[in-house]
Regions:
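P-loop NTP-binding/switch modules centered on Walker-like glycine-rich loops
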Residues: 42, 56, 181, 185-267, ...
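Conserved ABC transporter NBD signature motif
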Residues: 63-75, 425-433, 445
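Conserved ABC ATPase "signature" region
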Residues: 75, 127-146, 255, 482-499, ...
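ABC ATPase NBD coupling module
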Residues: 76-93, 119, 241-246, 277-283, ...
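Conserved ABC ATPase signature
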Residues: 150-155, 159, 504-508, 512
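A short, proline-enriched helix->beta-strand linker immediately N-terminal to the Walker B motif
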Residues: 170-174, 523-527
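Charged, flexible cofactor/metal-binding loops and thiol motifs
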Residues: 238-356, 368-377, 592-684
């Protein structure tokens, strides 16, 4: 199989105040023509550094210390800067992780796409615009003639990513590189982008590299997969090899950690113990030895050689695969699979558990024009972010709240805590109506309800130490306590070493910052924690650690959780009941297991079907939901989902369905649909 890009012996170092950082070591990767290659691994494994190195875009303190990167017959590492200008953008194009920061906010797409084509002197401005419009149409952007004149902030997240793909395709590149192309997207938009990449590959016979920590995305898209750990390639093979016959313990561990593969939600998620090693001082022997459940003495002293398996292109670096070792019988006996935690279960709360929180007909409205403009225009303009939301939370229960961006999930969570003022409705906690409480009474009640914010680093003051951050609630509520003692207690609860108390947020990893957020939320021993995207941006193993910690704290302290997320595998694993929101309204509410196995609302069905599975044989053939979420300022008449629903009828277009009770498999459920997909009143 001919390779478009062949990387051999690539080594990259970064100079830091602590000495050289050995980021990439002896990297060998082949990207076959017309194929999609995936690169996976935890944060810090070197995935993105490979991409920046072959594009010669390393930071000023980075250096390539050896190796070659042969692309279409020329070594990219031997080219000078002027020669590389004709490669970047023209022969190799990038789709970046965050289109909002990679696109220029003060330039229209017309201007940005014209600038990208600056080397095509033979094209007039009109020709460049027409070409850009054709590409925008190709990637599924509606009305490209009009939308090319708009700015990035006028586009939704999914449309911005489509525009980013259009920009990458403008110069007909030989190689398209997508760096975490769906990380910030909802499951429905993720499905659309995956479908688009598949179409581009089929139509243009494109060669694509995908960098991601999303195993479902890799299984859905890729032909070949490279697994990286701490700057080394530990396994390489076909997507079937990697998902069905993983040879390296690290690959096995990554797969076991994925909640989408853990069907029994009452189990604690498997995790990979320990942390990625410090690349300033490399350990002797196997780079993964310190975290491996199948480690041998040989692993600690000798680096493993690459072993080709079954005479195929499946290659892994592990002593366990050494034929000589297997023949001598020195391999470990009865070693549990990497990351296995079988037997650990989380009990499900009884349906008779005390109802701790009750939300009734809650509405939240935001003014969209400024106070001055509203006076000039004689009337303010409003959008309804949450409409008539009603739900309950029992003692010791986990309630999942899901929906696309803009559905009102976070606004509802903040309104429950009183962080956002509700227009109408009620929030009753432990028999007390929050609206009836004085400021002092509300402050007292807030000790029993805490919030974990979506961005753990952004929500922590960069000027405060961990000790100050996790003990601040005592000072806010004027509670006399030994702060040193409380800080030590909270660190122990969330398993943070005591020496972390003197660190600042920028010195923490994503998982460590998340633990600080959990500790801060637990400071005053609340009964309810509202967790907004508690695993967003985390690797699957770190994600498992945070979820296991939350489960353990729930068992120990009887906590109730309202978990807001668009990560459906996570929600399926942790939630007892589930609420689905669309355009500010609840459209389905009931038992989590039942909803995931038999969704009643078409929107819920589309969300569940849209989750990419870490199984190459379960690739989707259709996009789960077409179209964009309507604007809150211009809601559709009737059922608000009818503009995207494949089951919509005239009734759906004219009448809004109320949230009504149905019965499915003997359990009550609420659904807002004229024709529920399941249930006694609408069984299909």
């Amino acid at each position: 199989m001919e390779s478009l890009l062949s990387i051999r012996g690539l080594n990259v170092e970064f100079q830091t105040p602590s000495g050289p950082l050995h980021v990439l070591r002896d990297i060998n990767i082949d990207v076959p023509r017309g194929k999609i290659l995936g690169i996976v691994g935890e944060s810090g494994s070197g995935k993105s550094t490979v991409i920046w190195a072959i594009n010669r875009l390393l930071a000023s303190n980075g250096a390539i210390n050896g190796g070659t990167a042969t692309f279409d017959g020329q070594d990219l590492l031997a080219l000078n800067d002027r020669q590389m200008l004709s490669v970047r953008g023209e022969q190799i194009s990038m789709v970046f992780q965050d289109p909002m920061t990679s696109q220029i906010p003060v330039l229209t797409y017309d201007r940005q796409m014209s600038d990208i084509q600056y080397r095509r002197k033979e094209l007039s401005m009109k020709d460049k615009r027409e070409r850009a419009i054709r590409i925008m149409h190709k990637v599924g952007i509606p009305d490209p003639e009009d939308r090319i004149l708009q700015y990035p902030h006028h586009f939704s997240g999914g449309m911005r990513q489509r525009a980013g793909i259009a920009m990458a395709l403008l110069m007909d590149p030989l190689l398209l590189i997508a760096d975490e192309p769906t990380t910030a997207l909802d499951v429905t938009l993720e499905a659309q982008i995956i479908h688009l990449i598949q179409e581009l590959r089929a139509e243009f016979d494109a060669t694509i590299m995908v960098v991601s920590h999303n195993l479902g995305l890799i299984a859905e898209l890729c032909d070949q997969v490279v697994v990286m750990y701490a700057g080394e390639v530990v396994e390489y093979g076909s997507v079937s090899n990697l998902f069905y016959e993983p040879a390296h313990p690290y690959t096995q561990a990554l797969l076991n950690c994925d909640p989408a593969r853990t069907q029994t939600k009452t189990r604690y998620l498997p995790v990979i113990p320990g942390d990625v090693p410090d690349l300033h001082v490399l350990p002797t022997g196997c780079i993964f030895a310190a975290r491996c459940s199948q480690v041998m003495e040989q692993c600690k002293t000798t680096s493993p050689a690459k072993v080709q398996l079954d005479g195929s292109q499946h290659v892994a670096s592990c002593h366990l695969l050494d034929p000589g070792l297997q023949a001598s019988g020195d391999s470990p006996k009865n070693a549990s699979p990497q990351g296995d935690v079988s037997g650990k279960v989380r009990p499900k709360p009884s349906v008779e558990s005390e109802e701790l929180l009750k939300v009734e007909d809650l509405c939240v409205r935001f003014q969209t024009n400024s106070w001055i403009r509203s006076k000039i225009q004689k009337r303010p303009r409003f959008v309804d972010a949450v409409i008539d939301a009603s739900l309950s939370l029992r003692q010791g229960e986990t309630l999942g709240l899901v929906g696309e961006s803009g559905s009102g999930k976070t606004t509802l969570g903040r309104a429950i805590l009183g962080l956002v003022q509700a227009e109408s409705g009620s929030v009753i906690f432990d028999g007390q109506e929050l609206r009836d409480l004085s400021r002092a009474g509300l402050s007292q009640l807030r000790r029993n309800m805490a919030m974990m914010f979506q961005d753990p680093v952004g929500s922590l003051s960069p000027r405060q130490t961990v000790r100050s951050l996790i003990t601040e609630p005592f000072q806010i509520h004027r509670i006399n306590a030994d702060l040193d003692e409380e800080a030590a207690r909270l660190c122990e609860m969330v398993r943070l070493p005591q020496d972390f108390l003197s660190r600042y947020p920028h010195e923490l990893s994503g998982g460590q910052a998340r633990r600080v957020g959990v500790a801060r939320a637990l400071a005053l021993n609340p009964q309810i924690i509202i967790a907004d995207e508690p695993t967003a941006g985390l690797d699957v193993s770190v994600q498992g650690e945070i979820l296991n910690l939350m489960n353990e704290l729930q068992e120990t302290h009887g906590l109730s959780y309202l978990i807001i997320s668009h990560n459906l595998p996570v929600i399926r694993h942790v939630s007892d009941r589930l609420a689905i929101m669309y355009l500010g309204r609840l459209v389905e509410f009931g038992d989590s297991d039942e909803i995931f196995s038999q969704p009643a609302h078409p929107y819920t069905q589309a969300l569940v079907n849209g989750v990419p599975q870490p199984d190459p044989n379960r690739r989707r053939s259709l996009v789960s939901i077409e179209g964009e979420v309507p604007s809150l300022a211009n809601r559709p008449a009737g059922c608000e989902f009818h503009t995207r629903c494949k089951y919509a009828t005239a009734d759906c277009r004219n009448m809004r369905p109320p949230l009504s009770q149905i019965r499915v498999n003997g359990l009550d459920r609420e659904v807002a649909c004229h024709y529920p997909l399941v249930g006694e009143s609408g069984e299909q």
